[in-house]
Structures are given as C-alpha cells and as structure tokens.
A protein has these predicted regions:
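Sec-dependent signal peptide recognition
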Residues: 2-7
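Hydrophobic h-region of N-terminal signal peptides that target proteins for export
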Residues: 10-18
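N-terminal hydrophobic or amphipathic helices/low-complexity stretches enriched
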Residues: 21, 30-31
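Conserved SGNH/GDSL esterase-like catalytic core that processes O-acyl groups on lipids
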Residues: 23-25, 34-127
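Short hydrophobic segments within beta-strands
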Residues: 27-28, 165
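Short active-site segment of divalent metal-dependent hydrolases/proteases
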Residues: 31-32, 206
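Active-site environment of divalent metal-dependent phosphoester hydrolases
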Residues: 33-34, 171
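Alpha-helical cap/lid subdomain in secreted, periplasmic
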Residues: 93-213
Length: 213
C-alpha cells in the first residue's frame, strides 16, 4: 500500500512538473537561426565558418532555455529579415517580414522578438508612430510595422509573456523608436550591450552575454 501511495505521489509530482514547464518561441532574424531548428525554407546564419558558434547548445536561446528548464516551442527566425516590409536595396520584403510570420509560433508561454538589426542595416524607412489602422504601405516603415507587430502578437497570444530584444550598436533612430513603441504596448525591452561579435554576429561569448542579459 505504501509503495502504491509513493508511486502515486511521484506521478503527481511528475505531472505537475511537466505542466509547469514553460514553452518558449522566438521570432527573429539571423542572430537566432540555427540550421535544423528553423523552417527548412528559411535562410540560416549559424553554424558559419567565420564564427565560433558551432553547436546549437551555444545559441543564446538554447542557453536561456537550458538555464530555466524550459522547452523550445517554435523558432521562427529567418536570416536577413526585417520587422518592416522594406528590406535591403529598398526591396519589398513584406512576405518575409516579422509581421508576416506572427502566426507561426505555436502555443508559447514566452515569446522573444529579436529583430530590428536588418531594418537598421538596410536603412529601412523609419516612418511615423502609428498605433492603429495599419496598411501594407504603412508597414513598409519601421515604427508603424513594429507597432503592428506587437499589437498583433498581444492579440494572437494573449496569455504569453512578450519580450523584445534590441541589438547593440544600432543607429539611435532605431533604438529610440523601439523604446517608444515597446513603452506604448507595455512590452519589456531588453537592450543589449557589450555583445562580442564575429562577422557581425554574436560569438560564443556574445551568445552567453545575450542569454545573461
């Protein structure tokens, strides 16, 4: 009888522990890609010959998940993508933009949005602050696109904790715009600093810094 009781208690504990395991999804760009862990048609950066990150366990999100005891739900990260619908050389990137991928995150408890880097590097239009009634044309600029993205994520995943991550060494126009839009939607913004990079992307040391920050 005691053995049965003990087994039952262990089962209850195991079920409770499993129920408490949070699921994490990432909506990102090349900084969060790793071959085999993103959709097959997406362009990965990692692993790369010019960067010392070679194993998925060295990625910032993997380090975070391991440290917290969480599990990966979805990693919808695509190298070279912008939050807005204007990519490099002014090309229309609406189909690969962060906004176009909001429905691909599964059923997460936590969502990390790690973008804006390519918007900065591609010199995408900054636009005006706009918090409703977005058109496709509006979302070709950074400020309205980020607002549309956060608004859509909050409505699509109302129970999820939403965090935005802002890369270091971006132009101040992007930084300030991101702060303002995140403040409007009460989204916690993680502003990175002192991130070691190789070939423009976080190294092993940089990945650890991202995870820790």
């Amino acid at each position: 009888m005691k053995k049965l009781f003990t087994l039952a208690m262990l089962l209850v504990v195991a079920i409770a522990a499993n129920a408490q395991t949070k699921k994490v999804s990432i909506l990102g760009d090349s900084y969060s890609t790793f071959k085999g862990y993103i959709p097959e048609n997406y362009a990965p950066f990692y692993p790369d010959g010019n960067n010392d990150v070679k194993e998925v366990e060295q990625m910032w999100w993997s380090l975070y998940i391991q440290a917290k005891g969480y599990q990966l739900e979805k990693n919808d990260s695509w190298g070279g993508t912008t939050i807005c619908g204007t990519g490099y050389m002014g090309m229309d990137s609406s189909r690969s933009s962060f906004i176009a991928r909001v429905d691909s995150l599964g059923s997460p408890d936590i969502i990390f949005v790690f973008g804006g880097t390519n918007d900065a590097w591609a010199q995408s239009p900054i636009g005006e602050y706009q918090y409703a009634d977005w058109t496709k044309e509006d979302c070709k600029s950074y400020r309205p696109a980020l607002a549309c993205l956060l608004d859509t994520l909050q409505k699509r995943y109302p129970k999820a904790e939403l965090y935005a991550i802002l890369n270091s060494e971006l132009r101040e126009e992007i930084n300030e715009s991101t702060r303002e839009v995140c403040k409007h939607y009460n989204v916690q913004l993680i502003e990175l600093h002192d991130i070691e990079k190789q070939n423009g992307h976080p190294s092993i040391s940089g990945m650890k810094s991202i995870s820790d920050q």
